[in-house]
A protein has these predicted regions:
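Structural helix-adjacent loops and short alpha-helical linkers that scaffold large soluble proteins
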Residues: 1-5, 19-34, 77-88, 147-159, ...
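Generic N-terminal targeting/processing segments that precede catalytic cores or assembly contacts
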Residues: 30-35, 39, 52-56
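Long, well-ordered core segments of solenoidal/helical folds
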Residues: 6-15, 34-48, 85-106, 151-174, ...
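Extended ligand-binding groove/face enriched in aromatic
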Residues: 50-68, 73-147
Length: 201
């Protein structure tokens, strides 16, 4: 049994339907629709994601971090349909202001209700801890810029956050947190591809 076969065996034995559909998409000519159907079970009525999508915390409530995880799946399968219900739902959740700190202009990376459900210690919410950073805010801003109507309020919000994020990154480099860096990579790819830094910022 070669490495690919071992990986396939592991996936089929252990994976959730979402990861199985993603595997099939990449290696077995599976469809985007199958991935999206599996992903949709984690989406709540408010458009955000929870329900253990980010497997380190099983909070059923929508959170910025679980919603970010959903955007990573959409990126992975190359979804370009800006009118897809999952995309529309995510934008609705982000526009709602839920779990958004207006003073810092960032989404929380841990939320209070995390503590009510099984979770890894790093997802514990505490008012004393630093639960606001550009993880996942920078990546969520990238998602907004990629998918929102350019004339919408949420698009303008995404641009404002992106501008502040870039300014913070330039003044704070080097960044030692790999999670923050990965979110900035998402943002860079969007800003570089659409020349928004010079045109709109």
């Amino acid at each position: 049994m070669n490495t690919l076969e071992k990986a396939r065996h592991f996936i089929y034995k252990n994976a959730r339907p979402l990861e199985l559909a993603t595997w099939q998409y990449h290696f077995e000519n599976g469809s985007k629709e199958a991935v999206l159907n599996a992903l949709g079970f984690y989406q709540n009525e408010d458009g955000g994601f929870g329900n253990g999508l980010e497997a380190d915390f099983l909070n059923p409530n929508s959170s910025p971090m679980a919603t970010w995880a959903a955007t990573e799946t959409l990126r992975e399968i190359g979804l370009t349909d800006k009118n897809h219900p999952i995309v529309k739902g995510i934008l609705r959740y982000l526009e709602s202001g839920e779990h958004f700190d207006k003073k810092q202009n960032k989404w929380l990376n841990t939320i209070p209700s995390n503590n009510d459900y099984p979770h890894a210690i790093w997802w514990e919410y505490s008012e004393e801890s630093d639960n606001i950073s550009y993880n996942p805010t920078a990546a969520l801003a990238a998602f907004i810029i990629s998918y929102a109507d350019t004339k919408s309020a949420i698009y303008e919000k995404g641009l404002k956050i992106a501008k502040e994020a870039v300014e913070w990154f330039v003044s704070s480099a080097p960044i030692n947190d790999n999670h923050d860096v990965s979110c900035f990579i998402r943002l860079y790819n969007v800003l570089d591809g659409e020349a928004i830094i010079t045109e709109d910022m």
